[in-house]
Regions:
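N-terminal Rossmann-like dinucleotide-binding module
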Residues: 1-36
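Rossmann-fold dehydrogenase core element
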Residues: 95-112, 130-137
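Predominantly a Rossmann-like dinucleotide-binding segment in NAD(P)-dependent oxidoreductases
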Residues: 113-198, 204, 338
Length: 347
């Protein structure tokens, strides 16, 4: 994600890059050479903040550093674009949001699907299906090589159900416009000498119930053992019909563009005619002209710039981020304890 965001800033007329930070010498070199070594590079984040005095910071690091790095930037008066998840705990997430409000700085989260035109249409069509909704989603990734190394690093702090789940719970919240109230989850540790972190699971599935009666499930699994069968399910059913994303059949489950690309939207209408048969044919909406991953990151950064320039209120955006984080963390607790978790939404 960091490279894609750096490309977006490099190409943007709204931002000028003051410095690039990466703790590893090799990754720092790749980052610098991408832009012809034209920007200062740093191996230490705090040193970079002190020496460059930036107006804004983009944080695309491992999840367990997010809250601490965002705190350092906000305390220096910087606006912050922060990749998901907001923090590893709900308490830390709430503290970061409170700090942004205290200093009057913009805090934007990297919910990339909020800026994807096909996913925006997916949400809109789901809202037309009536209530309650049944939402079925997953993203399983059969990973190896560098992709598996990245997954192992992320799992040092959280399982895939949490890391990826915040995206899709956010989508469900936007589809229902309702509060999540109850969560249950299962998980499994699939390891045969692959080096999973101690105590960590690389497969999980959660079920969430919303206040309006809508229900959803989300499944995520990572690793060399994962099946590619039905790895990309994005399907919503309501009393009036259903809408589904038809994924491209040739996509690889660990290819980053496959995580957002839709292929087409299929809309099914439940209405019946006088003869008892369907009154309307299914609609297939092609989405051939979708933005790629770098373009989506550019759209995120354009919105970040707009939020700063026009002083947009990020309150609803941050509240949704808290809800999605609350659900996936509750799911992890449920899977660990075997209990159904009732959510406290008294904020």
């Amino acid at each position: 994600m960091g490279m894609s965001h750096a490309r977006a800033y490099h190409a943007s007329s709204a931002f000028s890059i003051a410095g690039l930070v990466s703790r590893g010498e090799e990754s720092r070199g790749r980052l610098s050479s991408e832009f012809g070594d034209m920007y200062p590079t740093f191996g230490d984040y705090e040193d970079a903040l002190r020496r460059t005095q930036p107006d804004a910071v983009c944080i695309s690091t491992w999840p367990d550093t997010h809250a601490a790095y965002a705190t350092l930037a906000l305390e220096r008066g910087c606006h912050v674009f922060l990749e998901k998840p907001l923090a590893a705990t709900l308490a830390d997430a709430e503290r970061v949001i409170a700090l942004a409000r205290k200093h009057g700085r913009k805090l934007m989260l990297g919910y990339i699907l909020q800026h994807h035109p096909s996913w925006m249409r997916f949400v809109t069509e789901a809202r037309n299906l009536g209530r309650p909704l049944v939402m079925r989603m997953n993203l399983n990734q059969q990973s190896s090589g560098s992709e598996w190394k990245t997954h192992l690093q992320i799992m040092q702090s959280m399982p895939p159900m949490v890391d990826c789940g915040v995206h899709y719970i956010d989508v469900m919240c936007r589809m229902t416009r309702s509060r999540p109230v109850r969560v249950h989850a299962i998980q499994a540790r699939l390891d045969d000498g692959f080096g999973l972190p101690d105590g960590q699971c690389n497969y999980g599935q959660l079920q969430v119930v919303f206040a309006d009666g809508s229900v959803g499930w989300y499944e995520a699994g990572w690793g060399p053992m994962m099946s590619r069968t039905a790895f990309f399910v994005k399907d919503v059913i309501g009393p009036r019909g259903s809408v589904s994303i038809a994924a491209e059949r040739h996509e690889s489950s660990d290819e980053v563009n496959a995580h957002t690309r839709t292929g087409a939207l299929r809309i099914h209408h439940a209405s019946l005619g006088p003869d008892g048969h369907f009154a309307r044919m299914d609609e297939v909406i092609p989405t051939d002209d979708e933005p790629d991953h770098d373009e989506l990151c550019a759209r995120e950064q354009a919105f970040f710039a707009k939020a700063i320039r026009e002083d947009l209120d990020p309150g609803e955006h941050l509240e949704a981020a808290l809800y999605s984080l609350q659900v996936v963390l509750a799911a992890e607790e449920s899977a660990r304890t075997g209990r159904v978790i009732t959510l406290d939404n008294a904020r």
